[in-house]
Amino acid sequence: MNLSDPKDCLYCQNNQTLHELMIEIAPLSVSRLFLFKEQTYRGRCLVAYKDHVHDLNMLSDEERNAFMADVVRVTRAMQKVFNPQKINYGAYSDKLSHLHFHLAPKYEGGPDFGGTFTMNQIGRASCRERV
């Protein structure tokens, strides 16, 4: 399996594996918004670019600005709905080569407050099994 190939990509294939991990909330301007089913971080979302792009630097200025506008739009909604103290942004693509941002709300007294968010063991094992 070559995760940099769109035919092996979780987001491009939009298959059962993806829908077991996340709920698609809405299409955005140039991306798709997902809510993780695993909610250690209440409100944790993911914004995935609409096309199979490996890195933010592969986008034109216009595409990058539109993608980041989608990310900001989501975080503003998260602030209104969940009222977290902070939102962690994660852009990891060494295991899944499709441009996406993890958005993890952080709450004082909640998991990993004051540090970076981490997937819990259930979430990590679930992703390993499915990808």
Where are the predicted features?
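HIT superfamily nucleotide-processing domains
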Residues: M1-R128
